[in-house]
Amino acid sequence: MGNLFKIGQIINTHGIKGEVKVYPLTEDVNKFKRLETVLVGGEEKKILGVKFQKDRVILKIEGIDSMNDAETYKQKYIEIPRENEPELPPDTYYVSDLKECTIYDTNEKEIGRIFDVISTPNNDVYWIKEPKELLIPVLRDIVLDIDIKLKKIIIKPVGEWQDED
C-alpha cells in the first residue's frame, strides 16, 4: 500500500487557458471539489477550479496557464496522500490496493496479477491480463481470502468454477 492515492489521470488539454481534462480514478468525483492541493506528476499544485463534463473532470491547476503548459502534463497522475482518504469498512478495499495483489489458487498456483477491477450490478470482477486473460467474479465461494498487506488473494482453482480451455 503506497502512501499516495491516485485519484485521476490527465488525459488531455481543455481550452486555451491551461485547463486539463481528467479521467477520474475515484467513484466520488465530488472529491475534486473538496481538495485544495494535489500532487501532479509528483509536484504539489493548488486546484483553482473544478468543472464536470460527462464522465470527466475539468481542472484548472496552479502553474498550468496555457494549452502548451497543459500538454506537458498529459498522462500524468493526480494523487493525494493516503491519510486524506477515509477508513474503509471490513472486507472493503481500495481498487489501487487490489491492483497491487497477485492471485493464487488454493493449490498455490499463481493465476496472475489484478490488472483492474470491473464493477457490475451484481458483483465486482477481477480482470487478470497475464499470463492468460481471465475474469474472476468476486463472490465469497470463489474468492476465499484477501490479504492486502501481503498483496495476496486466494481463490478456488479455476476449473472448479469455470471451464478451463
Curated annotation (Swiss-Prot):
UniProt key word Heme: no
Domain PRC barrel per the UniProt entry, residue ranges: 90-161
The keyword Chaperone appears for this protein: yes
This protein's UniProt keywords: Chaperone, Cytoplasm, Ribosome biogenesis, rRNA processing
One cellular-component annotation, GO: cytoplasm
A UniProt-annotated Pfam family: PRC
GO molecular function: ribosome binding
InterPro entries in alphabetical order: PRC-brl_dom (IPR027275), PRC_barrel-like_sf (IPR011033), RimM (IPR011961), RimM_N (IPR002676), RimM_N_sf (IPR036976), Transl_B-barrel_sf (IPR009000)
One Gene Ontology term from the biological process aspect of the record: ribosomal small subunit biogenesis
Parts of the chain that traverse the membrane: none
Subcellular location: Cytoplasm
Assembly and interaction partners: Binds ribosomal protein uS19.
Family, similarity comment: Belongs to the RimM family.
Domain characteristics, as noted in the entry: The PRC barrel domain binds ribosomal protein uS19.
Job description of the protein: An accessory protein needed during the final step in the assembly of 30S ribosomal subunit, possibly for assembly of the head region. Essential for efficient processing of 16S rRNA. May be needed both before and after RbfA during the maturation of 16S rRNA. It has affinity for free ribosomal 30S subunits but not for 70S ribosomes.
Name of the protein in question: Ribosome maturation factor RimM
Organism: Clostridium beijerinckii (strain ATCC 51743 / NCIMB 8052) (Clostridium acetobutylicum)
